[in-house]
Protein backbone atom coordinates (compact mmCIF):
# COMPACT_ATOMS: atom_id res chain seq x y z
CA UNK A 1 0.00 0.00 0.00
CA UNK A 2 2.77 2.39 0.91
CA UNK A 3 4.92 1.46 -2.07
CA UNK A 4 2.04 1.83 -4.52
CA UNK A 5 0.79 5.06 -2.90
CA UNK A 6 -2.71 3.63 -2.46
CA UNK A 7 -3.58 5.20 0.90
CA UNK A 8 -1.92 6.69 3.98
CA UNK A 9 -1.33 4.13 6.73
CA UNK A 10 -1.44 4.54 10.52
CA UNK A 11 1.98 4.54 12.18
CA UNK A 12 1.08 1.64 14.49
CA UNK A 13 0.76 -1.95 13.26
CA UNK A 14 -2.61 -3.62 12.79
CA UNK A 15 -3.73 -6.04 15.52
CA UNK A 16 -4.69 -9.56 14.41
CA UNK A 17 -5.62 -12.27 16.93
CA UNK A 18 -7.51 -15.54 17.31
CA UNK A 19 -11.04 -15.42 18.69
CA UNK A 20 -11.95 -16.73 22.12
CA UNK A 21 -14.51 -19.58 22.24
CA UNK A 22 -17.17 -17.06 23.27
CA UNK A 23 -16.32 -14.78 20.35
CA UNK A 24 -16.41 -17.73 17.96
CA UNK A 25 -19.87 -18.66 19.23
CA UNK A 26 -21.15 -15.09 18.94
CA UNK A 27 -19.73 -14.46 15.47
CA UNK A 28 -18.15 -17.50 13.78
CA UNK A 29 -16.61 -15.57 10.88
CA UNK A 30 -13.54 -13.33 10.53
CA UNK A 31 -14.46 -9.82 11.66
CA UNK A 32 -13.19 -6.55 13.07
CA UNK A 33 -13.76 -5.84 16.75
CA UNK A 34 -14.66 -2.17 16.35
CA UNK A 35 -13.04 0.35 18.71
CA UNK A 36 -15.10 2.90 20.62
CA UNK A 37 -15.99 5.92 18.53
CA UNK A 38 -16.95 8.04 21.56
CA UNK A 39 -14.56 8.46 24.46
CA UNK A 40 -11.80 6.48 22.80
CA UNK A 41 -8.65 6.54 24.92
CA UNK A 42 -6.29 4.86 22.49
CA UNK A 43 -8.09 1.64 21.65
CA UNK A 44 -7.77 0.36 18.11
CA UNK A 45 -9.75 -2.16 16.11
CA UNK A 46 -8.75 -5.81 16.22
CA UNK A 47 -9.01 -8.25 13.33
CA UNK A 48 -10.44 -11.38 15.00
CA UNK A 49 -10.11 -14.87 13.49
CA UNK A 50 -12.49 -17.59 14.79
CA UNK A 51 -11.08 -21.10 14.93
CA UNK A 52 -14.41 -22.96 14.80
CA UNK A 53 -18.18 -22.52 14.59
CA UNK A 54 -19.57 -23.89 17.89
CA UNK A 55 -23.14 -23.36 16.65
CA UNK A 56 -22.80 -25.50 13.54
CA UNK A 57 -25.36 -28.32 13.41
CA UNK A 58 -23.41 -30.17 10.74
CA UNK A 59 -20.16 -31.99 11.42
CA UNK A 60 -18.86 -30.84 8.05
CA UNK A 61 -15.75 -28.70 8.25
CA UNK A 62 -15.96 -24.96 7.66
CA UNK A 63 -12.84 -24.66 5.54
CA UNK A 64 -13.68 -21.37 3.83
CA UNK A 65 -11.18 -19.27 5.76
CA UNK A 66 -8.30 -21.62 6.58
CA UNK A 67 -6.29 -21.77 3.36
CA UNK A 68 -3.34 -19.52 2.62
CA UNK A 69 -4.69 -17.68 -0.43
CA UNK A 70 -7.73 -16.32 1.42
CA UNK A 71 -5.56 -14.69 4.10
CA UNK A 72 -4.61 -11.91 1.69
CA UNK A 73 -8.25 -11.13 0.96
CA UNK A 74 -9.31 -11.32 4.61
CA UNK A 75 -6.49 -8.99 5.65
CA UNK A 76 -7.41 -6.45 2.97
CA UNK A 77 -11.08 -6.59 4.01
CA UNK A 78 -10.89 -6.71 7.80
CA UNK A 79 -7.58 -4.96 8.44
CA UNK A 80 -5.86 -2.75 5.87
CA UNK A 81 -6.94 -0.95 3.80
CA UNK A 82 -10.38 -2.15 4.92
CA UNK A 83 -12.25 -1.92 8.22
CA UNK A 84 -9.35 -1.44 10.63
CA UNK A 85 -7.81 1.37 8.62
CA UNK A 86 -11.17 3.07 8.05
CA UNK A 87 -11.98 3.19 11.76
CA UNK A 88 -8.41 4.16 12.67
CA UNK A 89 -8.63 7.07 10.23
CA UNK A 90 -11.87 8.26 11.83
CA UNK A 91 -10.47 8.09 15.36
CA UNK A 92 -7.09 9.60 14.55
CA UNK A 93 -8.56 12.19 12.20
CA UNK A 94 -11.18 13.40 14.66
CA UNK A 95 -14.21 12.71 12.48
CA UNK A 96 -17.39 14.12 14.03
CA UNK A 97 -19.73 11.89 16.03
CA UNK A 98 -22.43 12.57 13.43
CA UNK A 99 -20.28 11.19 10.62
CA UNK A 100 -18.66 8.37 12.59
CA UNK A 101 -21.59 7.06 14.62
CA UNK A 102 -24.98 8.46 13.68
CA UNK A 103 -24.29 8.11 9.95
CA UNK A 104 -23.23 4.46 10.34
CA UNK A 105 -24.46 2.40 7.41
CA UNK A 106 -23.33 -0.93 6.04
CA UNK A 107 -23.20 0.29 2.44
CA UNK A 108 -20.31 2.56 3.41
CA UNK A 109 -18.52 0.23 5.82
CA UNK A 110 -18.85 -3.03 3.90
CA UNK A 111 -18.64 -1.31 0.53
CA UNK A 112 -15.28 0.18 1.53
CA UNK A 113 -14.00 -3.20 2.72
CA UNK A 114 -14.98 -4.95 -0.51
CA UNK A 115 -13.55 -2.05 -2.52
CA UNK A 116 -10.34 -2.45 -0.49
CA UNK A 117 -10.06 -6.04 -1.67
CA UNK A 118 -10.38 -4.81 -5.26
CA UNK A 119 -7.68 -2.14 -5.06
CA UNK A 120 -5.27 -4.61 -3.48
CA UNK A 121 -5.97 -7.40 -5.98
CA UNK A 122 -3.44 -6.34 -8.69
CA UNK A 123 -0.59 -6.56 -6.16
CA UNK A 124 -1.41 -10.02 -4.80
CA UNK A 125 -0.10 -13.41 -5.95
CA UNK A 126 -2.31 -15.21 -8.52
CA UNK A 127 -3.89 -17.61 -6.03
CA UNK A 128 -4.80 -14.68 -3.76
CA UNK A 129 -6.32 -12.80 -6.70
CA UNK A 130 -8.54 -15.83 -7.31
CA UNK A 131 -9.58 -15.76 -3.64
CA UNK A 132 -10.52 -12.08 -4.02
CA UNK A 133 -12.77 -12.96 -6.96
CA UNK A 134 -14.30 -15.86 -5.01
CA UNK A 135 -15.10 -13.51 -2.12
CA UNK A 136 -16.63 -11.00 -4.53
CA UNK A 137 -18.76 -13.78 -6.03
CA UNK A 138 -20.15 -14.52 -2.57
CA UNK A 139 -21.02 -10.84 -2.02
CA UNK A 140 -22.70 -10.57 -5.42
CA UNK A 141 -24.74 -13.70 -4.62
CA UNK A 142 -25.91 -12.07 -1.41
CA UNK A 143 -27.28 -9.15 -3.40
CA UNK A 144 -30.02 -11.32 -4.93
CA UNK A 145 -30.34 -14.31 -2.59
CA UNK A 146 -31.22 -12.19 0.45
CA UNK A 147 -34.12 -10.28 -1.18
CA UNK A 148 -35.37 -13.37 -3.04
CA UNK A 149 -35.58 -15.30 0.23
CA UNK A 150 -37.34 -12.49 2.04
CA UNK A 151 -39.81 -12.00 -0.82
CA UNK A 152 -40.64 -15.70 -0.89
CA UNK A 153 -39.16 -16.12 -4.37
CA UNK A 154 -36.67 -18.73 -3.19
CA UNK A 155 -36.69 -21.42 -0.52
CA UNK A 156 -33.86 -21.66 2.04
CA UNK A 157 -32.80 -25.09 0.77
CA UNK A 158 -32.59 -23.74 -2.79
CA UNK A 159 -30.45 -20.81 -1.69
CA UNK A 160 -28.22 -23.10 0.36
CA UNK A 161 -27.76 -25.40 -2.64
CA UNK A 162 -26.80 -22.42 -4.81
CA UNK A 163 -24.24 -21.22 -2.27
CA UNK A 164 -22.68 -24.66 -2.01
CA UNK A 165 -22.72 -25.62 -5.70
CA UNK A 166 -22.19 -22.29 -7.48
CA UNK A 167 -20.38 -20.10 -4.94
CA UNK A 168 -18.64 -23.22 -3.52
CA UNK A 169 -19.14 -22.47 0.18
CA UNK A 170 -18.84 -25.18 2.80
CA UNK A 171 -22.11 -26.50 4.23
CA UNK A 172 -21.65 -24.78 7.64
CA UNK A 173 -20.94 -21.40 6.03
CA UNK A 174 -23.80 -21.79 3.56
CA UNK A 175 -26.18 -22.47 6.46
CA UNK A 176 -24.78 -19.50 8.36
CA UNK A 177 -25.40 -17.32 5.30
CA UNK A 178 -29.04 -18.44 5.03
CA UNK A 179 -29.59 -17.76 8.74
CA UNK A 180 -28.09 -14.32 8.23
CA UNK A 181 -30.39 -13.45 5.32
CA UNK A 182 -33.56 -14.73 6.96
CA UNK A 183 -33.12 -14.28 10.71
CA UNK A 184 -30.06 -12.56 12.19
CA UNK A 185 -29.73 -9.63 9.75
CA UNK A 186 -32.20 -9.59 6.86
CA UNK A 187 -31.15 -7.12 4.17
CA UNK A 188 -27.73 -6.33 5.62
CA UNK A 189 -25.81 -8.76 3.42
CA UNK A 190 -26.89 -6.87 0.29
CA UNK A 191 -24.91 -3.83 1.44
CA UNK A 192 -21.51 -5.27 0.53
CA UNK A 193 -21.98 -5.43 -3.22
CA UNK A 194 -24.22 -2.36 -3.34
CA UNK A 195 -21.66 -0.23 -1.49
CA UNK A 196 -18.82 -1.67 -3.57
CA UNK A 197 -20.58 -0.80 -6.84
CA UNK A 198 -21.26 2.73 -5.59
CA UNK A 199 -17.57 3.24 -4.71
CA UNK A 200 -16.39 1.85 -8.04
CA UNK A 201 -18.79 4.16 -9.89
CA UNK A 202 -17.66 7.14 -7.79
CA UNK A 203 -14.02 6.41 -8.52
CA UNK A 204 -14.72 6.15 -12.26
CA UNK A 205 -16.58 9.47 -12.15
CA UNK A 206 -13.73 11.10 -10.22
CA UNK A 207 -11.05 9.77 -12.58
CA UNK A 208 -12.97 11.03 -15.60
CA UNK A 209 -13.34 14.45 -14.00
CA UNK A 210 -9.68 14.78 -13.00
CA UNK A 211 -7.86 12.88 -15.74
CA UNK A 212 -4.10 12.98 -15.13
CA UNK A 213 -4.66 14.88 -11.87
CA UNK A 214 -6.21 11.83 -10.19
CA UNK A 215 -4.06 10.39 -7.41
CA UNK A 216 -5.26 7.19 -5.65
CA UNK A 217 -3.65 8.02 -2.30
CA UNK A 218 -5.12 11.49 -1.88
CA UNK A 219 -8.48 10.23 -3.18
CA UNK A 220 -8.64 7.32 -0.75
CA UNK A 221 -7.43 9.50 2.12
CA UNK A 222 -10.28 11.89 1.35
CA UNK A 223 -12.82 9.04 1.25
CA UNK A 224 -11.95 7.65 4.70
CA UNK A 225 -11.73 11.18 6.14
CA UNK A 226 -15.45 11.64 5.41
CA UNK A 227 -16.52 9.14 8.05
CA UNK A 228 -19.43 6.84 7.28
CA UNK A 229 -21.51 8.98 4.96
CA UNK A 230 -24.08 7.08 2.88
CA UNK A 231 -23.22 6.73 -0.82
CA UNK A 232 -25.18 9.73 -2.10
CA UNK A 233 -23.71 12.12 0.48
CA UNK A 234 -20.24 10.68 -0.01
CA UNK A 235 -20.48 11.34 -3.74
CA UNK A 236 -21.54 14.92 -3.05
CA UNK A 237 -18.60 15.38 -0.65
CA UNK A 238 -16.12 14.01 -3.21
CA UNK A 239 -17.43 16.14 -6.05
CA UNK A 240 -17.54 19.34 -4.02
CA UNK A 241 -14.68 18.85 -1.57
CA UNK A 242 -12.17 16.90 -3.64
CA UNK A 243 -12.82 17.22 -7.37
CA UNK A 244 -13.77 20.90 -7.58
CA UNK A 245 -10.74 22.21 -5.64
CA UNK A 246 -8.37 20.17 -7.81
CA UNK A 247 -10.08 21.34 -10.97
CA UNK A 248 -9.92 24.95 -9.79
CA UNK A 249 -6.23 24.62 -8.93
CA UNK A 250 -5.49 23.11 -12.35
CA UNK A 251 -7.42 25.89 -14.09
CA UNK A 252 -5.53 28.52 -12.08
CA UNK A 253 -2.16 27.01 -13.03
CA UNK A 254 -3.06 26.78 -16.72
CA UNK A 255 -4.36 30.35 -16.60
CA UNK A 256 -1.05 31.59 -15.25
Regions found by a protein language model. Give the residues of each.
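Long, His/Glu/Asp-enriched segments that create or flank divalent metal/ion-associated functional microenvironments
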Residues: 1-256
Amino acid sequence: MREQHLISLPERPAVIRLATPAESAALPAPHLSIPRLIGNTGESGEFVLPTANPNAESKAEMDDFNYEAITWDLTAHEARPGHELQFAAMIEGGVSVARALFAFNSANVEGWALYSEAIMKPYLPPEAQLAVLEARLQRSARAFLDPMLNLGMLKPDEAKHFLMEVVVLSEPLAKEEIDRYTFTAPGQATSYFFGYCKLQALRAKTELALGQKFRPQSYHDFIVAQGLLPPELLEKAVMEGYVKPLQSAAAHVSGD
